[in-house]
């Protein structure tokens, strides 16, 4: 066998895994399916879905036999529903619609009040916000939606430090208080409020420093969008 023939044979052996990988990837990609649901605006009584006029479509992308990516196009914005391990496409479609409706209400809220975003995204474990400097009369608004129906994801807002307008305020130092430090400050009450997941609308009772935490009771993926609505 000539050196040229041996070189070609060796090259062919090295190419076999590469060719096999290309064929496998091609087969996987050919198995991906994207289903686009055009949105029909109309009356719910006629089995049509009433949605804001700027909603264009809902797309369910199957990336594996039991894994789906759900997205929706609202105006120039794409709403990402995240990864779902569920073959129930209709359930995903319904969930996307609910989120779109909520996004529409949030867009309206932007026009009605001054607001500041706290968080927006998908989480798989406990979420804890940074310290928030909030004033009495403001509101925490938004949505907490868990993917698992068994999840009783709890929303918790804690008053870390109450700020009172008085002359003697030397003890109201800025910074993070440890649990030990907090226990020593007797005249600053702590308050907690827990609610079931869904629409969040919590009025702020005092000027102060707050922290928000969200904890699912089972392993699940959940969507959070929270903002501070500033009022008088």
Swiss-Prot record:
Highest taxon of the lineage: Archaea
Source species of the chain: Archaeoglobus fulgidus (strain ATCC 49558 / DSM 4304 / JCM 9628 / NBRC 100126 / VC-16)
GO cellular component terms listed in the entry, alphabetical order: membrane
Subcellular localization, as worded in the UniProt entry: Membrane
Keyword Transmembrane helix (UniProt): yes
Keywords assigned by UniProt, alphabetized: Membrane, Transmembrane, Transmembrane helix
Topological category with respect to the lipid bilayer: Single-pass membrane protein
Protein's name in the database: Uncharacterized protein AF_2010
Ranges annotated as spanning the membrane: 10-32
